[in-house]
Amino acid sequence: MKCYIKDYPRAQFVRTDWENLNGTWDFGFDDENAGEKEKWYQEFKGDKKINVPFTYETKLSGIQDETRHDFIWYHRTINVDGVKLENNRYILHFEGSDFITKVWVNGAYAGSHRGGYARCSFDVTNLVHDGENELTVKVEDSFDTQQPRGKQRWINENFGCWYVQTTGIWKTVWSEYVPKISLASVKMTPDLQNAALKLEYEVAAAEKDLDDDLMITATVSFRGTTVAKQCVLANQKHVETTINVAYEGTVGLEWGVRVWTPAEPDLYDIDFAVTHKGEIVDTVGSYFAMREIRIDGPNILLNGHPLYQRLILDQGYWKDSHLTPPSEEALVEDIDKIHALGYNGLRKHQKTEDERFLYWCDVKGMLVWSEMAAAYRYTDYAVEEFTKEWMEIVRQNYNHPCIITWTPMNESWGVSQIETRKVEQHFTEAVYYLTKSLDTMRPVIVNDGWEHTVSDIITLHDYEEVGDTLYKRYTEYKDQILTTEVYHSGKSALANGYEYKGQPIIISEYGGIAFNNDDSGWGYGNKVNTKEDFIKRFDDITTAVKKIPYCCGFCYTQVSDVQQEINGLMDMERNFKVEPEIIQEINERKVGYWRTFM
């Protein structure tokens, strides 16, 4: 897209005056939690170096210590341009830092943030000066199962499908100069039926500047051709408007609206300019897509057409950097290889991925289910932390067209008694309706896999390894499964008190075939040791799922091996275990009721 800058962290809201703060930082463990008392933010006492944004547990950090350290400190100098400070604010951004992040600049406290997966930002304008400034960060983390932790272990060793913990900064740290009168955010909602885009602007300005001389101009273009331009008055902090994006052009060149699909992921550029008293004071580059995702009875429609989803579970782990992508190129490689395997989408599992990943999914046409990292205990504190961060994530990633489904919870993790316990059921309902209050256009699957309460799609997890058994289970016992008379995978499809209401049904986890050449690691079912055995089982169960007439999609587990879990289609270095064209042919083979839409 026109606004694209390599390695820029916030790909949907781009300013050019920024600095990447990744690289070598001073670092230290504070196992006695003495740093604040000893004022490390004034005189740093850490004795190590770390390569940010990689956590100390990883090889790429330069430390590679997998033991638990609950209190850690970072330090570096930052250079600030005093001339730019005259008309700008200086903002520090942390794309991801787990879990409690505290920031000091030049020894003065700048603020804190709780949560590990959403972006946090600090306006430190009043704490910096021209030239070199001291930036100090403390991060507190723990094995507390009440906090959202996703696939991070909460004991000292890996177990099951839980892996080495991620402590501290694990995504890009960066700074930008933001004009004092500026665009704080833009929420973009496509209206395909009316060929329009709804824009909701948030303006950052002093009250005295919110006058009739403050304007926002949006310019929409498609592949270099200007489609629409609109200027609106911005004399209040929240401004809503709608812009028509149908292109009429000259006679013979009309093409109306270009829609976004996995096959043709057409995107529009949109540029924003804020003017005050006739002078441009802020510019932001972005993009959007005209696409509609909605539920129609048992079908999921993309732009009004039935969508069959061929998804793969993607946990976003790398051998030497764990949750942190080693580079932007690694993100692109994953997307390209997932496409090569014949999938049109992915379920980003228990992780909010780097926003650059979402950018490339937008550009390359990869469907995404966005999922929250789970907590593993139900308490008032867990409810508060989960809800707060989930709302931050939905708002942060709302504009990405690749995201077609929100999935706050998985397999009753954090709500382990949801089948019968009303308070846990109420929590999932609250999360569902809160998500809907922010986003009316996307389906929400509150508890993926089983024990659903309110949900726009009913999803089922089943790791049966015999295709015929799998097929018969969901054709001969469909009604009993959906009325909970028969449990699938030992679990009820719906929680007590809830009924199936005709929603679309997807097998959103299956497969997980363990395949490597030694006896280490694990997967689901009996392990296979040869390529031929793997292909036979993969074909058997995938074909069985696709033949289920009412099932409108599937999600195979998983993209790559993750530490002790060896059930990926690739190993941790992203080498294919089986020729991708073989997997692609099986995935894309048209069978059963859905063959028209596959």
Task: Give residue spans per PLM region.
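Accessory carbohydrate-binding/adhesion or oligomerization-edge regions at the termini
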Residues: 1-62, 138, 142-147, 223-225, ...
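Accessory beta-strand-rich segments of carbohydrate-active enzymes
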Residues: 7-12, 26-32, 64-183, 225, ...
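Aromatic- and glycine-enriched glycan-recognition loops and surfaces
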Residues: 66-72, 80-88, 120, 263-266, ...
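Extended acidic/polar, glycine-enriched regions
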Residues: 126-132, 202-294
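Surface beta-strand/loop "capping" patches
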Residues: 177-209, 590-598
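N-terminal carbohydrate-binding accessory modules
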Residues: 186-187, 271-338, 443-445, 589, ...
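Conserved, compact domain cores that house catalytic/ligand-binding motifs in diverse enzymes
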Residues: 197-222, 300-369
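Substrate-binding/catalytic cleft of secreted carbohydrate-active enzymes
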Residues: 335, 345-574, 582-587, 593-598
